[in-house]
Curated annotation (Swiss-Prot):
InterPro entries reported in the protein's UniProt record: LPLAT_7/PORCN-like (IPR049941), MBOAT_fam (IPR004299)
Location, primary (coarse class): endoplasmic reticulum
PANTHER family attached to this UniProt entry: LYSOPHOSPHOLIPID ACYLTRANSFERASE 5, PORCUPINE
Function: Probable acyltransferase which may mediate the conversion of lysophosphatidylcholine (1-acyl-sn-glycero-3-phosphocholine or LPC) into phosphatidylcholine (1,2-diacyl-sn-glycero-3-phosphocholine or PC) (LPCAT activity).
Compartment(s) of residence: Endoplasmic reticulum membrane
Gene name for this UniProt entry: mboa-6
Position of sequence motif Di-lysine motif: 470-473
Lineage of the organism: Eukaryota, Metazoa, Ecdysozoa, Nematoda, Chromadorea
Protein name, per record: Lysophospholipid acyltransferase 5
Entry's EC annotation: 2.3.1.-, 2.3.1.23, 2.3.1.n7, 2.3.1.n6
Length: 473
């Protein structure tokens, strides 16, 4: 029995999970090595260091399955160097990377969340698809690009070593964060260094802060796993509870389960800050900003009271990819709802084949649509905006919003967190399919009624016609 196996027995954690955690924690000493010995070396030397370390981490976690990222690196090189700027390159990227991932899901799909080579490969999939799209943008005329595309467009094709380093960078190859090649190049070129060309010491405190926050979330998640195990929702003890308490326990379990993602992102971000990748320029006062690869905005995630706050605070890297590389490129559809549906379907497919993934994103779509319709009603109804803007109203609005998104997301996450239909169908039935009923039956009907019965601001008087103005003059 190896060291990891012994630790697995002592901690009751799976060996695969321990290997992943050790690899993520290794990002801190590796960051120290980079900022001590490699930060001012030529790009090729840094790339070689990243490739060697990244392959080692993959082998430590996945063994011979390291062949999968290697094949994808060669695929990315071929597409970006021999198909750059063509529509075919976008199709090829999805066939080569997303297709590769989906085949992996097909052969490794089980009833639980298993950590296999597909776990880190899903990160590489989006990174390389984004790379191909950025190279595609770089081949277009600048005047045809949107502002966000100009920031990430790559006009000079990356070489094989740079692509390998980009995909295998030790602080992003296993659990994220997502970042673009332009961001990676800025880091390798030393744009994050201080005026003396040295790694800024201002990275230390933010790095430690994110690490400690990640550890806190990890402890809370582990405590939650023992307190509310997944099996509880198919037990007699759960089914004998009242409807309110069944839904409340689901909501609490959802929050505690999400903390494992929060923990890994925060710990990884801390290491990214220490290495310099997290540098994001300077603020208005000239201080270094270290939120360049932020995946979790803690305060907004914990205190936000609408669905916008969730999207803006949680899994920011993937959400940014979806916004810039999928949603905004669907402008030709000329329909915001259709673009939203396509984007969420894309993310569901990226997660895998389980029905629950698609239902989760479906409920999310219903929630966001209901929120947008409610906001539109508030804006058009006289006195409503004024009433909720009063200080005395704010606490009640926050409580209502926080409970609404927490309970709605808790219901939806049942179908994601319990994975297999045979595990989540019982708990969903016990909640009487409440999320689907509210957002796809009750609210649409109520919205149509409110549109007809609520008063609205009077339309502004039409501007006088030029001819009429002349007559009056």
């Amino acid at each position: 029995m190896g060291v990891v196996g012994a630790l697995s027995e002592v901690t009751s954690a799976s060996e695969d999970a321990l290997r992943l955690l050790i690899s993520v924690l290794a990002g801190y000493p590796l960051a120290v090595v980079h900022r001590t010995f490699f930060y001012n070396k030529p790009a090729q030397h840094q790339h070689l260091f990243f490739v060697i370390v990244g392959l080692s981490l993959w082998m430590f976690n996945c063994g011979s399955s390291v062949i999968h990222p290697i094949l994808s690196i060669f695929g990315a090189f071929f597409i970006t160097n021999f198909m750059a700027g063509t529509d075919a390159s976008i199709y090829a990227a999805h066939i080569v990377f997303l297709g590769h991932l989906l085949i992996g899901y097909w052969f490794h799909e089980t009833d639980t969340y298993d950590i296999t080579w597909t776990t880190p490969f899903c990160i590489m999939t989006l990174r390389f698809i984004g790379l191909v799209m950025d190279v595609y943008d770089g081949a277009q005329k600048p005047e045809h690009l949107k502002p966000d595309q100009k920031l990430t467009a790559i006009s000079d094709k990356p070489g094989l070593l740079e692509i390998a380093a980009f995909g295998l960078f030790f602080q992003g190859t296993l659990v994220g964060p997502q970042f673009t090649l332009s961001k990676f190049r800025s880091f390798v070129n030393g744009d994050w260094l201080d005026s003396d060309g040295q790694p800024p010491k201002s990275a230390f405190l933010p790095s430690i802060g994110r690490f400690l926050a990640g550890c806190t979330y990890m402890v809370l998640h582990q405590w939650g796993q023992f307190w509310i195990p997944d099996q509880y929702f198919n037990s007699d003890a759960y089914n004998n509870l009242s409807f309110f308490w069944r839904w409340s326990w689901v909501t609490l379990w959802f929050r505690l389960t999400m903390y494992k993602y929060c923990a890994m992102w925060l710990i990884t971000e801390g290491a990214s800050i220490l290495s310099g990748l997290g540098h994001n320029g300077k603020d208005a006062e000239g201080n270094d900003r270290w939120d360049g690869v932020r995946d979790l905005h803690i305060i907004k995630w914990e205190t936000g009271h609408d669905y916008n706050s969730v999207v803006e605070s949680f899994n920011c890297g993937t959400n940014t990819f979806a916004k810039n590389h999928i949603h905004r490129r669907l402008r030709w559809v000329n329909n915001k709802l259709a673009s939203h549906v396509i984007t969420l379907s894309y993310l569901a497919i990226w997660h895998g084949y389980h029905l629950g993934y698609f239902l989760l994103f479906g409920v999310e779509l219903g929630c966001v649509q209901a929120q947008n319709q409610l906001y539109a009603l508030i804006k058009r109804t006289p006195g409503w905006s004024e009433a909720i803007s009063k200080p005395i109203s704010r606490p009640f609005i926050w409580i209502f919003g926080k409970l609404t998104i927490s309970y709605s997301m808790g219901f939806a996450f049942l179908m994601f967190g319990l994975i297999k239909t045979k595990y989540w169908i019982g708990p969903v039935k016990s909640l009487y399919f409440i999320g689907f009923i509210i957002y796809f039956i009750v609210w649409p009907i109520l919205h149509m009624v409110l549109l007809r019965v609520l008063p609205r601001h009077p339309k502004k008087a039409a501007a006088e016609k030029p001819e009429e103005v002349k007559k009056e003059l």
